[in-house]
Design a protein with these regions (language model features):
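Canonical tetratricopeptide repeat
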Residues: 42, 75-76
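Short coil turns that delineate tetratricopeptide repeat
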Residues: 34, 67-68
Length: 92
């Protein structure tokens, strides 16, 4: 399966809440290419969709460390704003 088809398939899995399968495919993709910022971004989306904000932020950070222009940078900022709004203790 080529890269674009795999990416589209993973996005479809995420959209359809087939999150375990998406995690499996993304984990394999990250194992085979540690510099795949898109895979880290998509993994962050999976964890965000599961409500695991801590892991989502971890993967978004990983993506932006590889590519500062990744959409993960904006996703991270949005999650940070939400976290600070919900729990003002994080924002002294």
């Amino acid at each position: 399966m080529d890269y674009d088809m795999t990416t589209n398939h993973i996005k479809s899995l995420i959209d359809n809440n087939c999150l375990d399968e998406a995690i499996h495919l993304l984990s394999h993709r990250i194992e085979t290419n540690k510099e795949d910022d898109e895979a880290y971004y998509l993994m962050g989306n999976v964890y965000r969709k599961q409500g695991n904000i801590k892991m989502a932020m971890f993967y978004y950070t990983s993506a932006t460390e590889i590519n500062a222009h990744s959409p993960a940078a904006e996703a991270y900022r949005v999650l940070l704003d939400i976290r600070n709004f919900i729990n003002p203790d994080y924002n002294p």
